[in-house]
């Protein structure tokens, strides 16, 4: 990391170096036109489009680097932020990496409720979150609780089968790994997703930070919305605009056809099928949907 000390003219942006968050983080950077080339031998890459240096770190370490002001921005999961117990701004929900940190027990075992695990051994890589959860469950402090929390760095789901613990606290996304290990969830400690996090005391120019955040917000908006354009009879316009109110307001333009107007509006991607059906039912015609590659909101 000695190279970092020579990058005082660049904003340091911490990115997960591998795992479930890496590829989607890179996709968001590409969408925000933060271009870079990463050498396989280095965990630092210089952006060719902005004065930014990307620092590739384990997702669990990113909250600490951002919280201590070593990096101005980072991408990581809320679970890692809470586990690190650092003070950072959760700037933008990036809408990926959605999963739950859950208490899991053997499916055919004796434990059905988390209260039954008081005084037992819990295996996890999220020690602080597990300690807080079970201390609260016992109604006491971490120092005084009877439940034992044991740390392992990986393959947490194998712990019960190997006799290391009575239960585990681990992340669940689809649940396939949990079921394959013969486990079932009985409680949720935390729901999490990936966020852009920001240092409380950034060292870089605030306008550059604002530019990066604006670009990423644009990417997120483009992923969430599509552009809907259609022709509408003027006498049906009030009803049609209830279906497509837009983010702020729709754009309405006169066309060379008496009694008709053209309407352009942003609609949520997940509702486009229902919206198009309703527009057609209400009398709209020439209804089209276009992808939004990027935007500023």
From Swiss-Prot:
GO terms for molecular function: ATP binding; ATP phosphoribosyltransferase activity; magnesium ion binding. GO terms for biological process: L-histidine biosynthetic process. InterPro entries: ATP-PRT_HisG_long, ATP_PRibTrfase_cat, ATP_PRibTrfase_CS, ATP_PRibTrfase_HisG, HisG_C, N-reg_PII-like_a/b, N-reg_PII/ATP_PRibTrfase_C. The modification N-acetylmethionine is found at residue 1. The keyword Transferase applies. It comes from Saccharomyces cerevisiae (strain ATCC 204508 / S288c) (Baker's yeast). This is ATP phosphoribosyltransferase. Catalyzes the condensation of ATP and 5-phosphoribose 1-diphosphate to form N'-(5'-phosphoribosyl)-ATP (PR-ATP). Has a crucial role in the pathway because the rate of histidine biosynthesis seems to be controlled primarily by regulation of the enzymatic activity. The keyword ATP-binding applies. It catalyses: 1-(5-phospho-beta-D-ribosyl)-ATP + diphosphate = 5-phospho-alpha-D-ribose 1-diphosphate + ATP. It comes from the Eukaryota. GO terms for cellular component: cytoplasm. The lineage of its organism: Eukaryota, Fungi, Dikarya, Ascomycota, Saccharomycotina. Pathway: Amino-acid biosynthesis; L-histidine biosynthesis; L-histidine from 5-phospho-alpha-D-ribose 1-diphosphate: step 1/9. Its EC number is 2.4.2.17.
């Amino acid at each position: 990391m000695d190279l970092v000390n020579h990058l005082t003219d660049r904003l340091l942006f911490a990115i997960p170096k591998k795992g479930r968050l890496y590829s989607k983080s890179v996709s968001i950077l590409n969408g925000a036109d933060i271009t870079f080339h990463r050498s396989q031998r280095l965990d630092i890459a210089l952006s060719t489009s902005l004065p930014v240096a990307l620092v590739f770190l384990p997702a669990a370490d990113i909250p600490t680097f951002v919280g201590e002001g070593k990096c101005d921005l980072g991408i990581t999961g809320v679970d890692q932020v809470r586990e690190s117990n650092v003070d950072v701004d959760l700037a933008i929900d990036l809408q990926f990496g959605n999963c739950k940190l859950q208490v899991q027990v053997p499916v055919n075992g004796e434990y059905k409720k988390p209260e039954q695990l008081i005084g037992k051994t819990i295996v996890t890589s999220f020690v602080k979150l597990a300690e807080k959860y079970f201390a609260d469950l016992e109604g006491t402090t971490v120092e005084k609780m009877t439940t034992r929390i044991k740390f392992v760095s990986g393959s947490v789901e194998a712990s019960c089968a190997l006799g290391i613990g009575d239960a585990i606290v681990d992340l669940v996304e689809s649940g396939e790994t949990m079921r394959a290990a013969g486990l079932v969830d009985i409680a949720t400690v935390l729901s999490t997703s990936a966020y852009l996090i920001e240092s409380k005391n950034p060292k870089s120019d605030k306008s550059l930070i604002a530019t990066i955040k604006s670009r990423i917000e644009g990417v997120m908006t483009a992923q969430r919305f599509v552009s809907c354009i259609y022709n509408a009879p003027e006498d049906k316009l009030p009803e049609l605009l209830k279906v497509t109110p837009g983010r702020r307001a729709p754009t309405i333009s006169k066309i060379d056809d008496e009694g008709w107007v053209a309407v352009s509006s942003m609609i949520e991607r997940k509702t486009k099928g229902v919206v198009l059906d309703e527009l057609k039912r209400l009398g709209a015609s020439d209804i089209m949907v276009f992808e939004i590659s990027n935007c500023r909101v």
